[in-house]
């Protein structure tokens, strides 16, 4: 073959798509936003707390990522990290419950659907529980209930604020009444925590539904939600079939709940850590620090009922009180 023929064949193969070798792109290098379809470099997305830079869609993250986003480096101490569920009911649907547990444990690297522990947020110690939707839809079984209850009890003993990040489809059907009773158990622990005058902040993420919504998700002193999160008890179709009415488009969203007074604030993930620190410091015992307008600024996408444009706070007679406008 002459040199001319070699170059001719080379040019022909480069123009033929079937002859052109495929470029290999490393897995996980780019992430596509499920809301707007934008491809974003994974490291850039992680630096933005897994919030799409184009449409601000909050991409679902694991419990491990949540802990890394909130807790100061090298301060996380897990509680009961190896607590695992058994199968006392010998439940089986398409597969035995015990097999399903093993499947999700291998898939996520977690023993169950929640991580709990003690750590610092900007040097402030907190008791943190983080539900993981990747483990059986974040469903609440006996292990989830037990770990959260122990976390709250430890926080009560050590006078720590409790923060629980909720992401759940509700009670775990494979555990029947053992799952449902966790609602009352966690709620009872939270009542003791409240009587000890300690702070509890639930953070509702997409989705927070079922028995979790009907119990500890809605028992906070201050209830925070991420933007556009689905929050509710029964599903939309079930409600529409029951009431025989068409529901609003934004029904069961965090924005709808804020408008109707069911939650206290919508805070973007990128501003969550800063907001939590301010709330924790504001609720410290004997804290009478003057809260300035600047310290309450949270950003254009953060909806707080106590933002500076709504109230100026001042101290009078050893109490923090709203100052009349004008």
From Swiss-Prot:
CoA carboxyltransferase N-terminal domain boundaries: 29-298
Record's function text: Component of the acetyl coenzyme A carboxylase (ACC) complex. Biotin carboxylase (BC) catalyzes the carboxylation of biotin on its carrier protein (BCCP) and then the CO(2) group is transferred by the transcarboxylase to acetyl-CoA to form malonyl-CoA.
Cell compartment(s), UniProt: Cytoplasm
Keywords: ATP-binding, Cytoplasm, Fatty acid biosynthesis, Fatty acid metabolism, Lipid biosynthesis, Lipid metabolism, Metal-binding, Nucleotide-binding, Transferase, Zinc, Zinc-finger
Pathway: Lipid metabolism; malonyl-CoA biosynthesis; malonyl-CoA from acetyl-CoA: step 1/1
Subunit structure: Acetyl-CoA carboxylase is a heterohexamer composed of biotin carboxyl carrier protein (AccB), biotin carboxylase (AccC) and two subunits each of ACCase subunit alpha (AccA) and ACCase subunit beta (AccD).
Cofactor note: Binds 1 zinc ion per subunit.
Gene: accD
Homology family: Belongs to the AccD/PCCB family.
Residues binding Zn(2+): 33, 36, 52, 55
Gene Ontology CC entries for this record: acetyl-CoA carboxylase complex
Taxonomy of the source species: Bacteria, Bacillati, Cyanobacteriota, Cyanophyceae, Oscillatoriophycideae
InterPro entries registered for this protein in UniProt: AcCoA_carboxyl_beta, Acetyl_CoA_COase_Trfase_b_su, ClpP/crotonase-like_dom_sf, COA_CT_N, Znf-ACC
Cofactor: Zn(2+)
NCBIfam families: accD
Annotated zinc fingers (C4-type), start-end: 33-55
Residue span of region Disordered: 302-326
Comp. bias intervals (Polar residues): 309-326
GO BP term, example: malonyl-CoA biosynthetic process
PANTHER family per UniProt: ACETYL-COENZYME A CARBOXYLASE CARBOXYL TRANSFERASE SUBUNIT BETA, CHLOROPLASTIC
Organism of provenance: Trichodesmium erythraeum (strain IMS101)
Highest taxon listed in the record's lineage: Bacteria
MF annotations from Gene Ontology: acetyl-CoA carboxylase activity; ATP binding; carboxyl- or carbamoyltransferase activity; zinc ion binding
Catalytic activity: N(6)-carboxybiotinyl-L-lysyl-[protein] + acetyl-CoA = N(6)-biotinyl-L-lysyl-[protein] + malonyl-CoA
Protein name in UniProt: Acetyl-coenzyme A carboxylase carboxyl transferase subunit beta
Coarse class of the protein's main subcellular location: cytoplasm
PROSITE patterns: COA_CT_NTER (PS50980)
Alphabetized HAMAP family for the sequence: AcetylCoA_CT_beta (MF_01395)
EC number: 2.1.3.15
């Amino acid at each position: 073959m002459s040199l001319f023929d070699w170059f001719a064949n080379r040019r022909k193969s480069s123009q033929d798509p079937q002859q052109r070798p495929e470029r290999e792109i490393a897995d996980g290098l780019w992430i596509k936003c499920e809301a707007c379809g934008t491809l974003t470099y994974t490291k850039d997305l992680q630096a933005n707390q897994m919030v799409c830079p184009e449409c601000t869609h909050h991409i679902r993250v694991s419990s491990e990522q949540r802990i890394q986003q909130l807790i100061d480096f090298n301060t996380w101490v897990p509680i009961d990290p190896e607590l695992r569920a058994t199968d006392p009911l010998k439940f089986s649907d398409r597969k035995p419950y015990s097999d399903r547990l093993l499947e999700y444990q291998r898939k996520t690297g977690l023993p169950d659907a929640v991580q709990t522990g003690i750590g610092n947020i900007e040097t402030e110690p907190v008791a943190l529980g983080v539900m993981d939707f990747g483990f059986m839809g974040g469903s609440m079984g006996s292990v989830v209930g037990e770990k959260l209850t122990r976390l709250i009890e430890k926080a009560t003993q050590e006078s720590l604020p409790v923060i629980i990040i909720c992401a759940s489809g509700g009670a775990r059907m494979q555990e029947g009444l053992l799952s449902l009773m966790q609602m009352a158990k966690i709620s009872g622990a939270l009542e003791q925590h409240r009587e000890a005058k300690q702070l509890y902040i639930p953070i509702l993420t997409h989705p927070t539904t079922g028995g979790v919504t009907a119990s500890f998700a809605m028992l906070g002193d201050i209830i925070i939600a991420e933007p556009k999160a689905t929050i509710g008890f029964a599903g939309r179709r079930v409600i529409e079939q029951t009431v025989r009415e068409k529901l609003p488009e934004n029904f069961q969203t965090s924005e709808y709940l804020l408008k109707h007074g069911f939650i206290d604030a919508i805070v973007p993930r990128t501003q969550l850590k800063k907001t939590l620190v301010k709330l924790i410091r504001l609720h410290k015992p004997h804290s009478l620090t003057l809260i300035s307008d600047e310290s309450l600024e949270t950003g254009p996408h953060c909806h707080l009922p106590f933002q500076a444009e709504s109230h100026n706070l001042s101290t009078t007679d050893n109490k923090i009180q709203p100052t009349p406008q004008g």
